Amino acid sequence: MLIMNLQLFAHKKGVGSSKNGRDSESKRLGVKSADGQFVLAGNILVRQRGTKIHPGENVGKGKDDTLFAKVDGVVKFERLGRDKKRASVYPVDVEAIAE
């Protein structure tokens, strides 16, 4: 009786899947209107997670903590003590800007 001891090897390389290669889309957070910039009512000033910058004069806060201008005016970023910041919009005369 003939006994054959065969060892079969893979003829195609097994390719494992990588555990990398995924990432979430960036949320485009940050300051959208600079200090001293003229903005219109409704313009977004800051997109943020949590209140890193607090709303000040004529600035509203959306449910996702976005700060937006309530009136036409000039943006001013101010400090509240040592650790807090505030964004305000101060109205200006349109005639004064045009001149």
From Swiss-Prot:
GO terms for biological process: translation. It comes from the Bacteria. Keywords: Ribonucleoprotein, Ribosomal protein. GO terms for cellular component: cytosolic large ribosomal subunit. The N-terminus is cleaved by ribosomal processing cysteine protease Prp. Pfam families: Ribosomal_L27. Residues 1-9 form a propeptide. HAMAP family: Ribosomal_bL27. PANTHER family: LARGE RIBOSOMAL SUBUNIT PROTEIN BL27M (PTHR15893:SF0), RIBOSOMAL PROTEIN L27 (PTHR15893). This is Large ribosomal subunit protein bL27. The lineage of its organism: Bacteria, Bacillati, Bacillota, Clostridia, Eubacteriales. The gene is rpmA.
